[in-house]
Amino acid sequence: MAMQPSYPAPFGAAAISSSAGQEVASTIRRQFTDADADRIVETPLGEKADSSDTAGPDSEDGIDQEGHDKITALARSLSQISQKSAGPTNTFLDPSSDPELDPNSDKFSSRKWMKNLLHIKTRDPDRYPRRTAGVSFRNLNAYGYGTAADYQADVANMWLKGFGWLRSILGCRNRVQIDILRNFEGFVRSGEMLVVLGRPGSGCSTFLKTIAGETHGLWLDEGTHIQYEGISWDEMHSRFRGEVIYQAETEIHFPQLTAGETLLFAAQARTPANRFPGVSREQYATHMRDVVMTMLGLSHTVNTRIGNEYIRGVSGGERKRVSIAETILCGCPLQCWDNSTRGLDSSTALEFVKNLRLSTDYTGSTAIVAIYQASQAIYDIFDKVIVLYEGRQIYFGKASDAKRFFIDMGFDCPDRQTTGDFLTSLTSPSERLVRKGYEALVPRTPDEFAARWRESAERQRLLADIEAFENESPLGGSKYKEFTVSRAAEKAKGTRAPSPYTLSYPMQIRLCLRRGFLRLKGDMSMTLATVIGNSIMAFIVSSVFYNLDQTTNSFFSRGALLFFAILLNAFASSLEILTLWQQRPIVEKHDKYALYHPSAEAISSMIVDLPSKFLVSVVFNLILYFMTNLRRTPGHFFVFYLFSVTITLTMSNIFRWIGAISRSMAQAMVPSSIFMMILVIYTGFTIPVRDMHPWFKWLNYLNPIGYAFESLMINEFSDRRFPCAQYVPAGPGYEDVPLSSKICSQKGAVAGQDYVDGDAFINTSYRYFSSHLWRNYGIILGFFFFFLAAYIICSELVRAKPSKGEILVFPRGKIPAFVKKSRRDGDLEGAPTFEKQQLDNAGHDSTAAIVKQTSIFHWQDVCYDIKVKGETRRILDHIDGWVKPGTLTALMGVTGAGKTSLLDVLANRVTMGVITGEMLVDGRMRDDSFQRKTGYVQQQDLHLETSTVREALIFSATLRQPASTPHKEKLAYVEEVIKMLNMEEYAEAVVGVLGEGLNVEQRKRLTIGVELAAKPALLCFFDEPTSGLDSQTAWSICTLMRKLADHGQAILCTIHQPSAILMQQFDRLLFLAKGGKTVYFGELGPNMETLIKYFENKGSSKCPKNANPAEWMLEVIGAAPGSHADQDWPEVWNNSPERAQVRAELARMKEELLQRPPPPRTKEYGEFAMPLWAQFLVCLQRMFQQYWRSPSYIYSKAATSIIPPLFIGFTFWREPTSLQGLQNQMFAIFMLLVIFPNLVQQMMPYFVTQRALYEVRERPSKAYSWKAFMLASILVELPWNILMAVPAYFCWYYPIGLYRNAYPTDSVTERGGTMFLLILIFMMFTSTFSSMIIAGIEQPETGGNIAQLLFSLCLIFNGVLASPSALPGFWIFMYRVSPFTYLVSAVLSVGLAGTSVKCSDIEILHVPPPQGQNCSSFLDAYVQMSHGRLLNPEATSDCQVCPVADTDTFLAQVSISYSDRWRNVGLLFVYIVFNIFAAIFLYWLIRVPKKRSRKIKEE
């Protein structure tokens, strides 16, 4: 009897008979054929399978597609392999037992790991039920809605936009249905790969999003039928959400987390409940993470932060692979990849697609991929292809049959053109080739192509196949039940059956909590900055109110201190709105992946923030409470701290709720700023409750800060007697007056008492009652829980604003007629497309206008070294070459070879490092005008969003062409450039943003046009002009460069590995290897024969006939995945006769060119083409135009200048001249200053936008000087802010009634005009202050924080909250340097001076005179001395005294005099001028490259 093989208990079968094992093995062998096993011979990293791998009796060597359909979804990890032995190994418990199964081992084999895992799962199908998701679709029609015209909003027509929006809301506006996808049909079985081909705008992304269920802004026709092997579309995207994933081309991750932490989170969120027995969740997730990272070559990044554009982290390619790994770990059986190879070179793209192939083959998953510039090797990996043409389906079927289908139709595929390029070229009339004799038979329009497809026999077979496929998996059938059972087996205990999530809600919260603390650990800077900043602010505020005395003199100071304390505690969380918006795209992505509820992240984020909130609160409140000598008893301190912490948490919930209900950042920030102002005003300190007007008084009842402030005042004053510090009467002659004839000067005082009762004071002054203390706490808790629930609910339900589809935007009145017509007709392609332009301009040749270049640019022995971590690293190593007029030279190389570095060095754009070698123009050194006389087409398409295409070209031509060229001639040349680039139909279109503006190709053409408009006299540099473009657009760009070269332009162009056809456009090639070493420089020859012969003659393998020479060359030098170089090719080049010929030619060229007479020195050889004043005017004009076309900014500025002043005006409506009325008017002026930070923060982003464009593109091109830029940037703000002063003045000054104070002095007009001047100065100061702060700061958020800090200091030390006499001596300098000191002094004096005070009843002091005296004889001396007023001089009892007789006395108490108003005005103008000069100086100091600090050496 044969011994039974034993298996570890964790696999669910303690022992299994030999016959049972053989039965399993035979079943698997029936499922997997040898042919398919042979097809999968490589791991994702190009590792060859071991042909000597002999399988045991239970291993699965041959795998066919049918078998894969029957294997369970292993999408989290099933890209690995099994082992050689008959029994599987539990790699989760002990991965080190077999190095080939250990992802941390150098011997790890992903294929063996995969086979091992498959073996385990097939042994217990009941425990691990299978789950697959193919898809079929019939009559798929998708559409959106548009309007008859799309025009650019500006300040003038914004109202028309608003009316149109209102009409659409009311249903009065006719919406035009725009068809996007029309009559799509097809099916993809599980385990298959479908490639989606089409040009941008053809509907590729929409098709993928529809399959994946992301249909925001899209509508599906009622007849559309989509099902996923028995599961309906609706159910798949609700109950089974996350099983079909749309992978966008952008990478969105938390930058603070490491790659390992990011992927571990995804693995944990989808860790199934039906794991192998004995394997914990942590073990499972960690092992799966390690396997996938090893598979994708990410193991070395496990502890490296993801990073982003501001935080250093993994490279861009590694970040893209992290996104791919995250999708794999999500375990979805159907994946939609939207251009995920964008920006990758062809070898990296091939590696990515091979990974997908391995996953689908082993797991039975399904992949649908839209891909650009697919090489033949990539295309051949796919099973099926769908070709789209302007929203129509023109083919669906086997990838291997597509080429023959169209060739039989009458089209021709040139030699060496890939199948993918051939199929997409059919959608471009200028590129498709028709076989001879078929010219009248082939289709030409999208509708004709679609009709030919619908009439084809291939389509009839497809329909039959779809019917058979759907009959195999009817809705609700066996596959649906298997899918449901499989999904249920993975769900954790406590998860609802209809829930799409794998984890239960508490588990999701715990998982998000863990990630939240990791994020906090990864970036402690914000927490530390908050703690340090609040500590500093606590010390500053506490020093201002240091050690308050215990007498009635401290009443106002204590109230102001508690007001400041509660506001600082309440608004400590205001920036959480920004934090929420930074993470919102990530949370929404994970919700689509069904990793966790957004509300789970919301709850966890609040919990994660609690420790830092408590720490900040403890530090701030401890310092403030005890330094200022607030009520020093344990009970009262803890009451103070309890209310402070509670209001912090409550306001945090409110700010989070505002962020959650907003669908854009602007929607969140504008209401929050107005909301904060309302809370400040209606707290109860600036205007007491009894003085609030009824139309706004209700706001106090809805203000949680108001309840907290009342409780803090009660806590400080209740049950406490304060010794009187100032009696009435007092002073010389009143020393012997008995106490019975005196009264304390504070509210709530009683005659004859030497103290003031705290309860009486707060009752009289604020109507606060001690019984409200804990009632208020209960109300605050009510606010806390209400907004907590609201935040959680809204975070779950409200989604961010979806992006719009691609549309062109034109200035109003300049929309082309054909655009209007096409949109009325509901045509998706109504916007101009390149093919229409090509047809319209087929006979036009505008390149004749190009001035032929005559200079030769040549370089020899160019080296470039930089310092990296203290060590010198050579980036470029002795590069030789030249660019002659009329030639197109390609610069190629492997990733990291230094292509862009060489381009930057040659273009003189490098600002650090050491450069050696010769770079000459006609044998002479480059002069100051070199950068201006060269065109540099950057890889990034950077343009001002508000400019039109023509305006961008005119700007470049005006500033960069010589000043001697007439302006009319420059404009005429711009028109020629527009024709040359075939941009006539969108020349008036606004650049805009992607999706609402120019598309990718149009932007690239504009980038080229901007450089051509400068009429470069020397040469043009092109940096990756085809990166990220589809093959047809790349072809059009290359043909354009060829055309330019043919007309005399000299062009040097870096390019990622292009197709063979693209390479034929180039004359010469400079190829670099790793380390910046030359591999080849020379002619390409016809069909690249010269290049091929060079490598073949040097010992390389022969180039196959149909191979792409560019890819073959990479394989030869060992740069392609899985390839190895058999010799040192840079060394081969250095020793070759070809290099010797290059060196000889350089020597000859230098000698001959030096014999030419040097050009005469003229103004055209200066750094800039135009004088400074002309640069300034042109820049200023463009900036004014930008502001005019940014109505959201201007109207936000207007709203900030109108709504808060108007609200303040009606809050302090016609304030009387009582003591409280004067204080209210003073606070009305104080509150007007609160709009300052809002205006500042609005301005900064627009400056940063202009500066980024200038520094990245226009400064290196020497278009204009930084002085012109700074002066224009500062000046452009001033008119708008001056304009805003008008509504701010009228909305604030007159409602408050400040003009009435001028009646007694008969100076209403004069003081009204002075007040307007002061508001004007305030607005000008705000503008210039903003420019000064942001001039040298990188990010507007950082600038906003600095401005907020300086604003807070100015607010504290302006003399309102604390008078100069009350300030400690060492803070007097802050009072004197604060600009708000002089602004508040001027505004208060102009607004209040020169009128009498009329005390209200509660402000009148009732003093009993001594017996035998009337009030006049008793108090006349006192009121004259104190500048008060005696109201009843003849009375003999109850003398009524108003402590202040006129407003001048009131102002004198805060050191303000009306006579200083013009001095203050002059000082404010000094501050404005200082801001301007400081902005210019700071920009020069921080951001202008200094020649002496560039550390560049040219020898």
Curated annotation (Swiss-Prot):
<dbReference type="InterPro" id="IPR027417">
    <property type="entry name" value="P-loop_NTPase"/>
</dbReference>
<feature type="transmembrane region" description="Helical">
    <location>
        <begin position="1227"/>
        <end position="1247"/>
    </location>
</feature>
<dbReference type="InterPro" id="IPR034001">
    <property type="entry name" value="ABCG_PDR_1"/>
</dbReference>
<dbReference type="GO" id="GO:0140359">
    <property type="term" value="F:ABC-type transporter activity"/>
</dbReference>
<feature type="transmembrane region" description="Helical">
    <location>
        <begin position="635"/>
        <end position="655"/>
    </location>
</feature>
<feature type="domain" description="ABC transporter 1">
    <location>
        <begin position="166"/>
        <end position="415"/>
    </location>
</feature>
<comment type="similarity">
    <text>Belongs to the ABC transporter superfamily. ABCG family. PDR (TC 3.A.1.205) subfamily.</text>
</comment>
<feature type="transmembrane region" description="Helical">
    <location>
        <begin position="669"/>
        <end position="689"/>
    </location>
</feature>
<dbReference type="Pfam" id="PF00005">
    <property type="entry name" value="ABC_tran"/>
</dbReference>
<keyword id="KW-1133">Transmembrane helix</keyword>
<dbReference type="InterPro" id="IPR034003">
    <property type="entry name" value="ABCG_PDR_2"/>
</dbReference>
<dbReference type="GO" id="GO:0016887">
    <property type="term" value="F:ATP hydrolysis activity"/>
</dbReference>
<protein>
    <recommendedName>
        <fullName>ABC multidrug transporter A-2</fullName>
    </recommendedName>
</protein>
<feature type="transmembrane region" description="Helical">
    <location>
        <begin position="526"/>
        <end position="546"/>
    </location>
</feature>
<feature type="transmembrane region" description="Helical">
    <location>
        <begin position="1353"/>
        <end position="1373"/>
    </location>
</feature>
<keyword id="KW-1003">Cell membrane</keyword>
<feature type="transmembrane region" description="Helical">
    <location>
        <begin position="1466"/>
        <end position="1486"/>
    </location>
</feature>
<feature type="transmembrane region" description="Helical">
    <location>
        <begin position="1268"/>
        <end position="1288"/>
    </location>
</feature>
<feature type="glycosylation site" description="N-linked (GlcNAc...) asparagine">
    <location>
        <position position="763"/>
    </location>
</feature>
<dbReference type="GO" id="GO:1990961">
    <property type="term" value="P:xenobiotic detoxification by transmembrane export across the plasma membrane"/>
</dbReference>
<feature type="transmembrane region" description="Helical">
    <location>
        <begin position="561"/>
        <end position="581"/>
    </location>
</feature>
<feature type="transmembrane region" description="Helical">
    <location>
        <begin position="778"/>
        <end position="798"/>
    </location>
</feature>
<dbReference type="InterPro" id="IPR005285">
    <property type="entry name" value="Drug-R_PDR/CDR"/>
</dbReference>
<feature type="domain" description="ABC transporter 2">
    <location>
        <begin position="857"/>
        <end position="1100"/>
    </location>
</feature>
<feature type="transmembrane region" description="Helical">
    <location>
        <begin position="1193"/>
        <end position="1213"/>
    </location>
</feature>
<comment type="function">
    <text>Pleiotropic ABC efflux transporter that confers resistance to structurally and functionally unrelated compounds including azoles such as itraconazole, posaconazole, and voriconazole.</text>
</comment>
<keyword id="KW-0547">Nucleotide-binding</keyword>
<dbReference type="InterPro" id="IPR017871">
    <property type="entry name" value="ABC_transporter-like_CS"/>
</dbReference>
<keyword id="KW-0677">Repeat</keyword>
<dbReference type="InterPro" id="IPR003593">
    <property type="entry name" value="AAA+_ATPase"/>
</dbReference>
<feature type="glycosylation site" description="N-linked (GlcNAc...) asparagine">
    <location>
        <position position="339"/>
    </location>
</feature>
<dbReference type="InterPro" id="IPR013525">
    <property type="entry name" value="ABC2_TM"/>
</dbReference>
<dbReference type="InterPro" id="IPR010929">
    <property type="entry name" value="PDR_CDR_ABC"/>
</dbReference>
<feature type="transmembrane region" description="Helical">
    <location>
        <begin position="1317"/>
        <end position="1337"/>
    </location>
</feature>
<dbReference type="Pfam" id="PF01061">
    <property type="entry name" value="ABC2_membrane"/>
</dbReference>
<keyword id="KW-0067">ATP-binding</keyword>
<keyword id="KW-0325">Glycoprotein</keyword>
<feature type="region of interest" description="Disordered">
    <location>
        <begin position="80"/>
        <end position="107"/>
    </location>
</feature>
<keyword id="KW-0812">Transmembrane</keyword>
<dbReference type="Pfam" id="PF19055">
    <property type="entry name" value="ABC2_membrane_7"/>
</dbReference>
<feature type="binding site">
    <location>
        <begin position="893"/>
        <end position="900"/>
    </location>
    <ligand>
        <name>ATP</name>
    </ligand>
</feature>
<dbReference type="InterPro" id="IPR003439">
    <property type="entry name" value="ABC_transporter-like_ATP-bd"/>
</dbReference>
